[in-house]
Structure formats: C-alpha cells, structure tokens
Amino acid sequence: MSLQDRLTELRDQGLADIKSADVLKKVNQVKVDLLGKKGPITEVLRGMRDLSPEERPKVGAYANEVRDRIQAAIDERREELEQAAVNEQLAAEKLDVTLPGREVPQGQPHVITQIITELEDLFMGMGYQIVDGDEVEEDYYNFERLNLPKDHPARDMQDTFYITKDVLLRTQTSADQPRSLENHDFSKGPLKVLSPGRVYRRDTDDATHSHQFHQIEGLVVDKHITMADLKGTLILVAKTLFGDQFDVRLRPSFFPFTEPSVEADVTCFNCNGKGCAICKQTGWIEVLGAGMVHPHVLEMSGIDPEEYGGFAFGLGPDRFAMLKYGVDDIRNFYLNDVRFLSQFYKKG
C-alpha cells in the first residue's frame, strides 16, 4: 500500500471516529491517536525519507491536507458537542412562564404603625401638617416651654431619662409644640400640626406600662378657636378608630400646658357601657387627654393669647391598639411574634 493510500485510509477512519464521538473526551482521544507524536500519520511522514525526490513533495502536501482535514473535523465536532451541552443545560433550566408564580412571603405594617398611619391620613385630610420631632430633646422644650417649671413633680429624675443635665429623651411629643409655635407664620393661616413618635419614661415594664411607647400630639392655633372645635375633633378621632356605635364624653382634668383641660372617654368596648371589670364598672374607658392651649405657653412663643387661642390633644397609639383589639398586655406588641401581629393586618 502506497503512503498516499495509507493517508487516505487514516483520514476516512479518523473522520468516521470523530463523527461517532458523542462526548468531548472521545473527540480529544481521536486527536491524540491520529495526530499525536506517536500516531499513524506521524509514522507515515517519517516514511517519506524513503521516497524519491519527485514523490516526496506530493506525499508531503497530501499529508498536510489530510491532517488539516482531520483537525477541522475535530474542531467542528467539538463545537457541536459544546453547543449541545449548552442547549441541554438551557432546556433543563427553562422556565415555564405559563405556570402560576410562587407567592413570596411579605412583611406587613406593625399594628401600631397602622393606627398611626390611619390617624395621619385622617388629620392630613383635615389640613394638618405631620411634624417629626427629635427624640433627644432639650429640657427647656420638653418641660419649661410647656409650663412645667423646674420644681414640677413630672420632672423628677425617676420619671425621665436624662442624658446630660439639660438634654433628655423626650417624655412627650408635646415637646414639638413650642418649635411649631415659634416657626409658624400666622399671616399665612392657622397652625395645624400632628406630631407622632416614640417617647420615653422611666417606668417598669408591665402589662400596661413600657419605658418606650408612642404618642401622637395634635395642636391647632388660630383666632376664635373654642372648646367646641376641640370636642368635634376628638369625637371624629374616636369614631374613626373605634366606630360610630361608641359614644364619647369629656370630663375635667388637669395638664400644665392646657387650661381648661379634659380627658376623653369612649363607651367600654367590653360591656357596651353597662359596667364591667375592664372599665371599673363605669361604662367608660379613657382614651386621650386634651385641652385649650395655656395662655402662658402661647406667650412664651411670642403669641398674644388675647388674639389667638388653640387646642391640643395627646393620645397613645399603643393604648388605642390595646383597647381596639382587646389586648391585655402592651408587651405583646414588642415581642415580634409574627403569629400574634399578623392577625391585625388590614390589607389595602
């Protein structure tokens, strides 16, 4: 058999082996077997030394042609197998877009956040501006500007977290009132602000007390403001949160920064006003405190109490949540038990 015939035989056999190779490993093995240093094509090339000078160039050119043809077939088959592997992987990872999606568990607003948001929406609809005050406050704004002199019992160290002698964690969102009064331009209309936020007291945590809780303070100042305006606002708040079926009453009380002062009660949720242990047989439950802004508070902000008046009210979203949903321990709101909190979530 001539060298050219041997090369043709090796070419045909190699192309057949390449075509039948179904994995890259087999393709690579064909390359080593045919084109390697110890392969048959290399052996044929070594035999060219026995050829005549006239035959040697022809056989050499044909040998290169065979080698190039085999290498091209190897490259082509390798590319086919690599693409097939990619296609197989893509098919395995293919998503059926017609299948229903898997619902991802979502978080939800905390029950107290829901109540705060509900009240913010209510009051913004009435023209109030939402004010976010500082939780770290000056003693001057937290107490003195609210008609709480230095010897007032509420300023005792056991009730307040002091950071320095003159700086503290605010005990009430009422501390936002003085700054609102100072900064408002009454030539542009009445002052109507709502101040929600966290406040701090040196209380021992129990079923009804917490060292950190929430307050919402409302303040309205304008000419010709009366107690009737305050009463109408409080009734609207109570009925929005608790429902129209509950009555609201005002009774006299005392707060240093309002005069006169009142407390608002609503019909007991548990007994519908008949009297029970929860309402201490009165048929009423206290929900918030309020009153007409004290003239001295207005004067300290440079406002003439003879020309302007106003009302203020403060309520606790934590307490509202306890009353509205019948929760008997305020600490339950802060244990982060999703099973407990999820029952209060209102969609939409």
UniProtKB/Swiss-Prot annotation:
Residues the record lists as binding Mg(2+): E259
Main location: cytoplasm
Keywords recorded for this protein, A-Z: Aminoacyl-tRNA synthetase, ATP-binding, Cytoplasm, Ligase, Magnesium, Metal-binding, Nucleotide-binding, Protein biosynthesis
GO cellular component: cytoplasm
Localization annotation: Cytoplasm
InterPro entries: aa-tRNA-synth_II, aa-tRNA-synth_II/BPL/LPL, Phe-tRNA_ligase_II_N, Phe_tRNA_ligase_alpha1_bac, Phenylalanyl-tRNA_Synthase, tRNA-bd_arm
PROSITE patterns documented for this protein: AA_TRNA_LIGASE_II
Reaction it catalyzes: tRNA(Phe) + L-phenylalanine + ATP = L-phenylalanyl-tRNA(Phe) + AMP + diphosphate + H(+)
Cofactor(s) listed: Mg(2+)
Gene Ontology MF terms in the entry: ATP binding; catalytic activity, acting on a protein; magnesium ion binding; phenylalanine-tRNA ligase activity; transferase activity; tRNA binding
GO BP term, pick one: phenylalanyl-tRNA aminoacylation
Disulphide-bridged cysteine pairs: none
Organism superkingdom: Bacteria
Note accompanying the cofactor annotation: Binds 2 magnesium ions per tetramer.
UniProt keyword annotation of Transport present: no
Enzyme Commission number(s) from the entry: 6.1.1.20
Family: Belongs to the class-II aminoacyl-tRNA synthetase family. Phe-tRNA synthetase alpha subunit type 1 subfamily.
Subunit and partners: Tetramer of two alpha and two beta subunits.
HAMAP family: Phe_tRNA_synth_alpha1 (MF_00281)
Name of this protein: Phenylalanine--tRNA ligase alpha subunit
Organism: Lactiplantibacillus plantarum (strain ATCC BAA-793 / NCIMB 8826 / WCFS1) (Lactobacillus plantarum)
